[in-house]
């Protein structure tokens, strides 16, 4: 088949040779690239072309002709349908190889670093049963049964679950029971097309070290007759459940949580032990979903920095202080910068609760706060959202020249972009790059880059 005759709907044979950063298998056909979900390098497959462009196409696995040695039987019975995990069909050791390769490729292609010093991927506990948080959209089946699960790949159709192998198994009993109770009380499920109904999502969260659980219903406006009574029944039925909340989200939006969260039974937070400190974690708090690996990455950061107690540290995008507070015990002063006022309030409470008094928190956008700090910190910790750092943040760092920067990223493409800017003209040098598997069974990877101010950076 020549390049000009490739059409949507055709079946083609492809040898999968790589994985994309979104988790799809990548092969070539007629000098063009083909992206195929649910495949593994080493697979020989028959692919149905779905979306065809001049130089590439997206296809669907039609038939597995020859399996890769890295292909395994998924540990989840709905892995082929559910959009929650992309890689349950891939041997875990190969997942780690692929993630390290993904980091190296991005740093080379986007960052322009010829030989980035990328360590093997950091792992800790099991690659299943690790998630401390689950947020399930709800739906109603054709027979009127309440369903909760994850969206089917490429759609908003809910794949109904009673358990999920990547979630902490202590959350599974609540998933099945809450669906049953919603059904019995005949509470209306939200219909996103008509913007009618009430219950949009079920949120479950657990302290991995304490076992405490929070249950949250995300609702359109909260009109659920008998919800307070039902919340008390849930607390009595499940001793590990410490709080039930309603989050109000009245908007036509794909955002899960709205701005207003109200505790209707128990307490509005769970307690979690992280790095030897006790944190209060609320339903809508950002907290890494793999507690053990997040803690292991913090230990790498502590070891690499080797703080001596005289330093000033700025933690940009600090959230509730998950990294700020443990590191504050090793420096003279720590300053956390965070856009969300609610997160800063929690960070202050967490600091007070743990008796930490050498830390302060400031509310505001990092790109506005950092240039006005008026100090040259010894260490700056960056942990931005997926979009990476604003250009003003990079320029501020290049102007103030802190001796060391630790950049933690959940999207390696934006990390590579920002590192390229920071290392322009040799101002900073990459000392080490440590990736960590915060999201086993998916294509996502967390990365920490350690930068030091070079001699030329000091001289300029």
From Swiss-Prot:
Domain TRAM: 5-63
EC number: 2.1.1.-
Binding site for S-adenosyl-L-methionine: 288, 317, 338, 383
Residues noted as binding [4Fe-4S] cluster in the record, renumbered to the chain: 76, 82, 85, 164
Alphabetical list of PROSITE patterns matching this protein: SAM_MT_RNA_M5U, TRAM, TRMA_1
Signal peptide stretch: none
GO biological process entries: rRNA base methylation
CDD domains reported in the protein's UniProt record: AdoMet_MTases (cd02440)
Highest taxon of the lineage: Bacteria
Top EC class, one word: transferase
Catalytic residues as annotated in Swiss-Prot or TrEMBL: 410
Family matches, as InterPro entries: Methyltranfer_dom, MeTrfase_TrmA_AS, NA-bd_OB-fold, SAM-dependent_MTases_sf, TRAM_dom, U5_MeTrfase_fam
Pfam families linked: Methyltransf_31, TRAM
Gene Ontology MF, one: 4 iron, 4 sulfur cluster binding
Keyword terms, alphabetized: 4Fe-4S, Iron, Iron-sulfur, Metal-binding, Methyltransferase, S-adenosyl-L-methionine, Transferase
Ligase in keyword set: no
Assigned protein family: Belongs to the class I-like SAM-binding methyltransferase superfamily. RNA M5U methyltransferase family.
Protein name per Swiss-Prot or TrEMBL: Uncharacterized RNA methyltransferase alr3654
Annotated organism of origin: Nostoc sp. (strain PCC 7120 / SAG 25.82 / UTEX 2576)
